[in-house]
């Protein structure tokens, strides 16, 4: 049976287990917002194509009560099998809102809904994360580990923030950075 299953799915089943699921229909970001409690806590991804990292970030979002994941046009789907596996299935509990133009969506979130759109920008000494007020509605924006946030998306954000770090370390894995940012929300809103 294992060989037959591997033939059907086209890849090696490490533990001989296969799951079948249905991808939920996409959620329109601006249709979703009126149904969410305030202050909003959102996460957006720009250019995040590593499915494993995306899956762990999804799991982190679920753990910290993020209300929706906004997936920019240059990011991978959080429903890729490796993303689903690394999310430990939490991707099916978190509303996922794909957008065709992340820059435009972020500008609209800020202008029309008062959401602070905060770019995770390693190396920024201007705004360190603990100094940023995240008690109100906010959307953290994370980019790919190699390229970071694209210039157009960075320009669309209302501010940037960096995690204070020592010893010449300039960045963290995106899911780890996400956990630090989201913990700061938990700390400030306590």
Residue ranges and their predicted role:
Residues 1-11:
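Small-residue-rich anion-binding loops in enzyme active sites
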Residues 1-3, 17-20, 26-125:
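RNA substrate-binding interface of SAM-dependent RNA methyltransferases
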Residues 8, 105, 171-175:
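Short, charged, surface-exposed secondary-structure boundary motifs
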Residues 11, 32-33, 81-83, 129-132, ...:
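Short secondary-structure transition/capping segments
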Residues 12-14, 38-40, 135-136:
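Short connector loops at helix/strand junctions that flank enzyme active sites
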Residues 16-19, 60-64, 75-91, 151-190:
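Structured adenosyl-cofactor binding patch, chiefly the S-adenosyl-L-methionine
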Residues 118-169:
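Active-site/ligand-binding-proximal alpha/beta "capping" segment
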């Amino acid at each position: 049976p294992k060989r037959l299953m591997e033939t059907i799915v086209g890849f090696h089943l490490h533990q001989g287990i296969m799951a079948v699921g249905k991808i939920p229909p996409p959620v329109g970001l601006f249709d979703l917002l009126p149904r969410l409690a305030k202050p909003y806590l959102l996460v957006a991804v720009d250019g995040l194509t590593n499915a494993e990292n995306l899956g762990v970030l999804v799991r982190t979002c679920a753990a910290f009560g993020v209300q929706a994941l906004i997936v920019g046009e240059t990011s991978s789907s959080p429903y890729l099998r490796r993303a689903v596996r690394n999310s430990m299935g939490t991707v099916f509990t978190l509303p996922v809102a794909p957008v065709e133009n992340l820059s435009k969506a972020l500008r609209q979130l800020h202008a029309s809904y008062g959401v602070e759109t905060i770019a995770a920008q390693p190396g920024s000494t201007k705004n360190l994360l603990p100094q940023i007020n995240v008690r109100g509605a906010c959307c953290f924006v994370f980019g790919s580990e190699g390229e970071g946030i694209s210039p157009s998306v960075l320009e669309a954000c209302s501010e940037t923030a960096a995690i204070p770090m020592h010893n010449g370390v300039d960045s963290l894995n995106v899911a780890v950075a996400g956990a630090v940012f989201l913990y700061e929300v938990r700390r400030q809103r306590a």
